[in-house]
Amino acid sequence: MATTLTLSEAVTALQQGGVIAYPTEAVWGLGCDPRQETAVHTLLNIKQRASGKGLILVTAELNTLQDWLDLDTLSPERLHEVQTSWPGPHTWVLPASTRAPHWITGHHNGLAVRISAHPLVSALCRAWNMALISTSANVAGQPPARRREDLDPSLLPHLAGIVDGPTGGLAQPTSIRDARSGHILRL
């Protein structure tokens, strides 16, 4: 069984390139330092997920991602819609700058971002002072874990640890919308 981590221990694990599990708004997530390409590839290998699909970033403050985003290309109305939906269970694909790492964007020209209202996720991102990869804690194609005890045992040996707590109680993972068009990409 993977070790339970405090927030400061989780930050240390992230700094060292580790992958952690933590509860999100609806399901358990896997996370790592988005700046470390090796850590992201480790996470993708654990999930058996294709790298071209792109990944979601969760953060407490949008300014932690300012170098990776090109928000000037959004209309004021679209930007307002995005900003007023946060913090909350809304993931938006925002225009990525040329500095956004390809290992996060995948084969896309946008960056999927959520400013979470989940207390533990927000506290973790604040302690970390950076965004965190947020992808469901499951092998690709399998159902995501809704409780810690539902985490796939095959994932556990690969984790640096688990930040324990309840999920936010949502019935479904967060919606994903395209910030440029407003179209719903995932309900």
From Swiss-Prot:
Keywords: ATP-binding, Cytoplasm, Nucleotide-binding, Nucleotidyltransferase, Transferase, tRNA processing. It comes from the Bacteria. GO terms for cellular component: cytoplasm. One of its GO terms (molecular function) is double-stranded RNA binding. GO terms for biological process: regulation of translational fidelity; tRNA threonylcarbamoyladenosine modification. The keyword Nucleotidyltransferase applies. It is found in: Cytoplasm. Its EC number is 2.7.7.87. It catalyses: L-threonine + hydrogencarbonate + ATP = L-threonylcarbamoyladenylate + diphosphate + H2O. Belongs to the SUA5 family. TsaC subfamily. Required for the formation of a threonylcarbamoyl group on adenosine at position 37 (t(6)A37) in tRNAs that read codons beginning with adenine. Catalyzes the conversion of L-threonine, HCO(3)(-)/CO(2) and ATP to give threonylcarbamoyl-AMP (TC-AMP) as the acyladenylate intermediate, with the release of diphosphate. This is Threonylcarbamoyl-AMP synthase. It comes from Xylella fastidiosa (strain 9a5c). The gene is tsaC.
